[in-house]
């Protein structure tokens, strides 16, 4: 999860987030190289006394500054499109969870079980236990199995919301009357925190998301005791 004074992205805990981190570094490297080239060119122009006074056209230069940007943009677009298709690809999910946004809480339904659903509200500051995080803890955590393909169905019952868990690379809009889906697969156990990422009213900041990823056997035990 995030920590104070953090400058970079959160540690990746899913294959999608790992790909996003690689793409971030790839794009940032290209931006750094272009910025360095531009600054170098500007410094040369400011320090040199040479001037082109008789040049009417420079077809070679015009060709190069047309081809090079196209190559650079292609090198950025192709990995981006690959990740975009990866986020939409869902292959034989073993579990389907439906998340509904409300003002201002989330409700979850485990559609593979007959009676396993609950509402998830933010824990008030006065009710926090030692070690719990202010504005991020909930009364009912969403327990999920790790290393398992999970399909998330996301919608809303009132206004626009957005279901986001940064360390898993997840952010999907919750739109009234529309059912969006995304895939989730965590590579390690633990607690993963997120929040509503769409301004949805006065208590928008009080819609935390807490996913508790556990081994499959522990999840089966929890689901049996809960349902």
Curated annotation (Swiss-Prot):
Mitochondrial intermembrane topological domain: 1-14, 88-227
Residues that hold Cu cation A2 according to the record: 196, 198, 200, 204
Protein name: Cytochrome c oxidase subunit 2
A Gene Ontology biological process term: ATP synthesis coupled electron transport
Chief place where the protein resides: mitochondrion
Cofactor names: Cu cation
EC number(s) stated in the UniProt entry for this protein: 7.1.1.9
Domain of life according to the entry: Eukaryota
Stated family: Belongs to the cytochrome c oxidase subunit 2 family.
Organism: Galeopterus variegatus (Malayan flying lemur)
Underlying gene: MT-CO2
